[in-house]
């Protein structure tokens, strides 16, 4: 049963324009987690998977409002550096380092697969085994045109060795059968690095797929940031790596209060149907402006990586502040570039916030905004991991980061609806509507759902379960004039079992969601 109450539009515009809070959601805080990865299923954006060191996995069926979790196990052992991706069949893949009882520490890269949304995982397959050489820092991408999976990582002859006879290289492997068999690892870098896990080590290889199946990847090392590509699915690569840019001060640097920090690069390619389709982007951080002024940077290429732009700064604060642990993604529906990073622009000590930035014009300009609902102090004796992460599709954006709270690490995300990012105070730029949290929440019987309409719009309001199955259509394609409206929803009439549900407000290309709990 539903009903409607109309309230006149008084002071709503002011409240709308002042909107700036992004709900923070705790993903998990068991096992001292850090170094998170997250992925939104582009085919079902309410389905998300995440992971963190050393063996944690998380999955959500309601757009990241709530999470289930567990620890992953494998006969190959699990030793962190997680990366998660999803293919077009809905299979989830979890890549990590190994620690087998029958081999050597991190002697291969492991891929474990889930076919039930992350509830259970296979024992896994592996790639890169090469005696006792160490295989480290994997990252993966799925070519969604054919579900081929690509992985890049760093191989150390002997991790931590200072011997000039030991070196580090970038390796590549692929699977064409949904992760069952992996190709023989292939070296794709020409200039080797050392094994000290520092500025002169080659690390940070994040592969991406281009509009026509190209594979692009960059990494950092003794030459700065360099780039390679394959035009035949990884069979062959360029004989000469392309120099992209210097990293003044190196990729391995110090941030006060952080156990270990780096500015390793992240590579992305725009394969949307937007105006910047085919653009390549590389994002990193460095201390070219001094050790007290770490900044986030971006370069781009419009010719498949042949030439690169000069670096542009992503963070828009005055000099003298720290921005670090950046990650980037491209929304392959809109072509928008999204960044997440830690930020101290509002503080003079170690107090830390989490910021995001977005570029809607192909990396020419950036808007920065804070997403953490409170600041935190890190502890230099607590390992924070080596990266944050972010995923986006069709204006649904989910960053993920590590936070220290009362001595305990936790993994957090934020509900970032891109329609709320960059609200202008010019009336012609305001958005058509907003959706408020239901009340009461949790719900025992009846709850009220309110929304505000700023421009006359045609509205649909529905309630779904966490699997995306429709429970009720409360408003079906009805036109509303400017104002505030309240719909009431009778949960008992629909015989809902206790648990999480969500409601969705849609008008044209604008889609808003919120979660509610039925007791």
Predicted regions, residues:
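Sec-dependent signal peptide recognition
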Residues: 2-11
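Edge beta-strands of extracellular beta-sandwich domains
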Residues: 512-517
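Glycine-centered coil/turn sites that cap beta-strands in beta-rich domains
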Residues: 424-464, 473, 485-495, 506-510
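Solvent-exposed serine/threonine-rich low-complexity stretches and specific carbohydrate-binding patches
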Residues: 472-480
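Extracellular, repeat-based ectodomains that mediate carbohydrate processing or recognition
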Residues: 21-421
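A glycine-anchored, Pro-Gly-centered beta-turn/N-cap motif
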Residues: 481-485, 497-500
């Amino acid at each position: 049963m539903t009903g409607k109450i109309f309230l006149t539009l008084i002071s709503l515009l002011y409240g709308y324009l002042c909107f700036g809070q992004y709900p923070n959601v705790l993903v998990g805080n068991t096992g001292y987690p850090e170094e998170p990865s997250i992925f939104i299923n582009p085919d079902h954006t309410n389905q998300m998977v995440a992971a963190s060191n050393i063996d944690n996995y998380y999955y959500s069926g309601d757009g990241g409002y709530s999470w289930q979790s567990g620890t992953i196990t494998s006969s190959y052992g699990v030793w962190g550096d997680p990366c998660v991706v999803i293919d077009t069949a809905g299979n989830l893949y979890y890549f990590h380092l190994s620690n087998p009882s029958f081999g050597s520490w991190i002697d291969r890269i492991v891929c474990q697969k889930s076919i039930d949304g992350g509830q259970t995982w296979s024992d896994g397959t592996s790639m890169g085994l090469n005696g006792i050489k160490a295989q480290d820092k994997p990252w993966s991408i799925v070519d969604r045109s054919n579900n081929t999976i690509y992985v890049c990582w760093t191989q150390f002859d002997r991790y931590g060795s200072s011997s000039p006879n030991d070196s580090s290289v970038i390796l590549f492997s692929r699977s064409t059968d949904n992760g069952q068999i992996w190709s023989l690892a292939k070296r794709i870098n020409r200039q080797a690095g050392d094994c000290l896990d520092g500025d002169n080590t080659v690390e940070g290889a994040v592969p991406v797929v281009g509009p026509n199946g190209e594979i692009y990847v960059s990494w950092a090392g003794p030459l700065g940031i360099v780039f390679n590509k394959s035009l035949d699915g990884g069979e062959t690569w360029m004989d000469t790596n392309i120099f992209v840019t210097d990293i003044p001060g190196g990729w391995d640097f110090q941030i006060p209060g952080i156990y270990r920090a780096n500015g390793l690069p992240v590579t992305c390619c725009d394969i949307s149907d937007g105006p910047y389709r085919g653009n390549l982007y590389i994002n990193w951080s460095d201390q070219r402006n001094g050790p007290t002024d770490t900044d986030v940077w971006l370069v781009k290429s419009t010719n498949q990586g042949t030439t690169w732009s000069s670096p542009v700064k992503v963070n828009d604060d005055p000099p003298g502040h720290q921005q670090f642990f950046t990650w980037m993604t491209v929304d392959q529906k809109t072509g928008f570039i999204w960044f997440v990073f830690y930020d101290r622009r509002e503080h003079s000590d170690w107090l830390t916030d989490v910021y995001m930035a977005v570029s809607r014009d192909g990396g020419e300009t950036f808007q920065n905004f804070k997403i953490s609902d409170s600041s935190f102090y890190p502890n230099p004796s607590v390992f924070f991991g080596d990266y944050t992460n972010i995923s986006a599709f069709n204006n649904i954006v989910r960053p993920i980061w590590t936070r220290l709270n009362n001595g305990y690490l936790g993994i957090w995300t934020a509900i970032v609806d891109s329609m709320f990012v960059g609200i202008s105070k010019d009336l012609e730029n305001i958005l058509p509507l907003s959706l408020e949290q239901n009340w009461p929440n949790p719900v025992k019987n009846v709850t009220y759902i309110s929304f505000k309409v700023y421009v006359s719009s045609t509205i649909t309001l529905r309630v779904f379960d966490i699997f995306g199955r429709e429970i009720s259509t409360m408003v079906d394609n009805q036109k509303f004039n400017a104002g505030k409206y309240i719909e009431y929803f009778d949960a008992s009439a629909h015989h809902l079992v206790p648990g999480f549900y969500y409601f969705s407000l849609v008008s044209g290309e604008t889609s808003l969601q919120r979660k509610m709990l039925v007791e």
